[in-house]
UniProtKB/Swiss-Prot annotation, chain B:
Major subcellular site: mitochondrion
Protein name: Cysteine desulfurase, mitochondrial
Record text on subunit structure and interactions: Interacts with FH. Interacts with SUFE1.
Family: Belongs to the class-V pyridoxal-phosphate-dependent aminotransferase family. NifS/IscS subfamily.
Naturally occurring in which organism (per UniProt): Arabidopsis thaliana (Mouse-ear cress)
Coiled coil: none
Amino acid sequence: MVSSSEVLSLCRALLRAGRQFPDYNIREYSKRRTLDGFRMNKNLTDPSKVTEAYAEAKKQLFVAERVLKVYLAYPPKTKNIMEVKLQ
Amino acid sequence: MASKVISATIRRTLTKPHGTFSRCRYLSTAAAATEVNYEDESIMMKGVRISGRPLYLDMQATTPIDPRVFDAMNASQIHEYGNPHSRTHLYGWEAENAVENARNQVAKLIEASPKEIVFVSGATEANNMAVKGVMHFYKDTKKHVITTQTEHKCVLDSCRHLQQEGFEVTYLPVKTDGLVDLEMLREAIRPDTGLVSIMAVNNEIGVVQPMEEIGMICKEHNVPFHTDAAQAIGKIPVDVKKWNVALMSMSAHKIYGPKGVGALYVRRRPRIRLEPLMNGGGQERGLRSGTGATQQIVGFGAACELAMKEMEYDEKWIKGLQERLLNGVREKLDGVVVNGSMDSRYVGNLNLSFAYVEGESLLMGLKEVAVSSGSACTSASLEPSYVLRALGVDEDMAHTSIRFGIGRFTTKEEIDKAVELTVKQVEKLREMSPLYEMVKEGIDIKNIQWSQH
C-alpha cells in the first residue's frame, strides 16, 4: 500500500515538473491534469487500485521529466500573448 | 599608513558607488525588462506586428503535439531505425514490432482489427485512396458515387477527377443545420452506385452526421460506405462496426499526433477491395507501397491510445470552454449566429457569423487570436466558404464567419481573452459600419434596392 505522504510528494513532483515547461499551454495543462488526476482518485481505497494509480502517475512523472529537458532546450522564441499581458 | 588610508578610501569609493550603481541598474533593468521585453516579444511577420504568440484557437486545422506523444516518438527515433519491412535482421524486427504495436493502438480506438489498418501519409491520401481506389477497382459494374456538398476538398476533388474519367457523382445537398437528409440519400442510391462517401465530423462547422443511420442505409442497399473521420477519431466515440463503414480515413495531427501520418481503415469482412494509388514493394497489404514512416506511425499510435484514455476528460473540459466562449460572445454582442447544428456537433468547434461586419477586416483585427474563417485550404481566398453556402447561409453572413477550434491545451483565460478581443473588434467595426447604423434605425437592409453608379 502506498502511503498518503508518498502520493502527496508524487503530486508535488509532477506539479513541479509541469511548472517548468516553457510553453504556456503545456504548463497550464499539466497543472490542471495533475490536480484533476489526483482529485479523481482521491477516494480510492482498494490497495491494488491505489498502487495502479500511483504507478501510472509515476510513469507520467518520468515522461514529464524526460520531455522537459527537450522542451527547455528549445524554448519558444517569443512568449505567448497570455504571458506578455500578465507581466 | 597613508597608503592604507588611500587604498581604503579607494576601496570605499569603488565599492560603495558601484554597489548602489549596480543596485540601481538592476532595478532599472528589471523595470525596463518588462517594457523592453514587451517590445522584444513582439513579432513582425507579414507586415503585422503582434505583441506575442497569438492564442491558438485553430484546433480543426491542426493540433500541437502532446508531450506524451513526443516522448513515445523520441524513444523510437533513436534506436528503431530499421526498415519495418526488413525481415532478415533485428533492426527490421524491432521497427516492425513498433509499427504493429501502433497498429493495435489505432485499431483499438476505432474498434477494428489491427489487420484492417493501412498506414498512409494522412487523411488526404486516405480519402483519395478510398474514393478513387474503390471506383477504379469496381469500374466495370459501378459507375456512380454519392457524396455531400460539405465534404472536405480532397474528397470533392477526387470525385471531380472521377467525373473526368466518366464516372457520375451525386453531390447531396445538406439541410440548413448541416446534416444530410437521409431520405435524399436513400433516393440517390442507384443499382450502379459504387460508393457513398460522407464525412463523420465536418471540419468547418463541426457537425456530426448520423453515422449509424447512414451506415444502415448503405448496408440495406449493399453499397460500400466511406467516411472521412479525420476530425472524429479520438474526439467522439468511433465504432466501425456500429457505423457499418467499409472504409474510414484518419489523421494523426488532428489528435495531438505528428503531421504526415494517417491511416485508412479497410474492412475485411465483408471484404472491400480497392486499387492502390502507390505501386511498389507491396507494403501494407499491397495497398500502400513505400517504407513505413516508423516514428510517425509510433506517434500516431501513442496519440490514439492517449486520445482513448483522455476522451471523456477532454470532452468535459472542451464543452465547458465552448459554452464559455459562446455565452461570452452572446452576452455582449447581438447578431451572432452559430453555423451548423448545435445539438449534433463536436464540442471543440464553434463556427460563428457576426452580422454587419466584414469578415476579412475582423480576421485582420484579430491578429492576436489564431483563428480562421473556415478550413485552412479556403481561408486564403476571399471567397466565402462553400460549406456555409451549402448550408444556405446568406452571402454576407458566410463572409463573416470565424471558426473557433478548442482543444486539450486551451485554457479558460485564453477563451476569456478571445471573447474580449473579438467583442472589441466587432464593436469597433460595427461602429464604422453604415449598415449597422441603418439596422439600428430599423431599416431592413435585405429590402434595400442598391442603385449602381
